[in-house]
Design a protein with these regions (language model features):
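Active-site ligand-binding patch in enzyme domains
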Residues: 150-152, 156-273, 280-284
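Conserved small/polar residues in nucleotide/adenosyl-binding loops
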Residues: 3-11, 301-308
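Short, flexible loop segments at boundaries between secondary-structure elements
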Residues: 227-236, 296-304, 310
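Short beta-strand scaffold segments in enzyme catalytic cores
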Residues: 34-39, 163
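Short, basic/aromatic recognition patches
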Residues: 13-27
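Residue-level signal for inorganic ion chemistry
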Residues: 17, 35, 85, 125, ...
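Residues at the N-termini of beta-strands
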Residues: 105-106, 199, 273, 294
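Zn2+-dependent cytidine deaminase-like catalytic core
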Residues: 38-140, 285-287
Length: 312
């Protein structure tokens, strides 16, 4: 039926909006990923996404894209992954841009998670006579903005624990003196995970034993994550790489006040995702406090240090 094919088409358009939103990953925080598709007479005439902090919002970029291509946006339908903002932040409100462009219908995947503005953008559009529907592919949008939504609700980062497993799948005993290396593909995944996080946390033992860099080097990144070292007894050497490479670091010594306070502090710094790369001791502290949101297994292969010469 044509109603069913309409629903299917609408989902396809929203899927495309979610797809283009991904182009901003790692570049827009603390803002969420947002994508916008403009459709007119059954054809996609423009697309936009929030590309970098302080840059155009998705709706503004899509409208600009339509103009560049010589398309008239009057009477177009906008598919947007997140409810358009109605306040002046780093840029003017997107609701105004949509009104100005003559969009006559807006389809939204997910409402604004901020309770102060939730529903605001939608009601402003409706008052101006624009037809608004929301909730199309809402689950997919929520998954895409998972860390952002978690931070909005809890004012704390989403905590991911990286578990190192050996070739048999058992958890690596990180207390072994052996240097740990991974396959190239696996290393790249580790670096991608770092890029997608705002902060990386380790305990003193990991720093003392491995002297890691914990930076993103194998994939392109706009900025390095904050490295957090929990070291209440101040055992880490002042010459550790982490403390001397000029990248952001928080070395918590006698000022460490426990994990809940640490997560609150990181939340205040607008850190939305924290990856734990520490050993079993550090991971257990997080588990005991019930503070882990997700586990990611990374399989390590044991090689002797002279066979490959790289550190993490």
């Amino acid at each position: 039926s044509s109603a069913a094919s309409d629903v299917y088409k609408r989902q396809e358009y929203m899927r495309r909006a979610l797809e283009v939103a991904e182009k901003g990953r790692g570049r827009v925080r603390p803002n969420p990923l947002v994508g916008c598709i403009l459709v007119k007479n059954g054809k996609v005439i423009a697309e936009g996404w929030h590309d970098h902090l302080g840059g155009l919002h998705a709706e503004q970029m899509a409208i600009h894209d339509a103009e560049e291509k010589g398309h008239n946006t009057n009477g177009a339908i906008a598919y947007i992954t997140l409810e358009p903002c109605n306040h002046f932040g780093r840029t003017p409100p997107c609701t105004e841009a949509l009104l100005w462009a003559g969009i006559n219908e807006v389809i939204v995947a997910h409402g604004d998670p901020n309770p102060l503005v939730r529903g605001n953008g939608i009601s402003v559009l409706e008052q101006a006579g624009i037809k608004v529907r929301s909730g199309l592919l809402e689950k997919e949008a929520a998954e895409q903005m998972r860390e952002f939504l978690h931070w909005c609700q809890n004012r704390r980062p989403y905590v991911t624990v990286k578990i190192a497993t050996d070739s048999t799948g058992s958890v690596d005993d990180l207390s072994l003196e052996a240097q740990r290396f991974t396959s190239d593909e696996c290393l790249e995944r580790v670096h991608q995970l770092r890029k997608d996080s705002c902060a990386i946390l380790v305990g003193a033992n990991t720093v003392i034993r491995d002297d890691p860099q914990l930076t993103v080097r194998l994939v392109q990144t706009a900025r390095q994550p904050l490295r957090v070292i929990i070291d209440p007894n101040n055992r880490v050497s002042p010459s550790a790489k982490l403390l001397n490479d000029g990248n952001p670091v928080q070395h918590l010594t006698e000022n460490f006040r426990g994990l809940p306070a640490l997560l609150d502090m990181l939340g205040d710094m607008e850190i939305q995702r924290l990856v734990i790369e520490g050993g079993p001791t550090t991971i257990n502290y997080f588990l005991e406090d019930g503070l882990v949101d997700e586990f990611i297994p990374v399989s390590y292969t044991h090689l002797r240090a002279h066979e490959t010469g790289r550190n993490l």
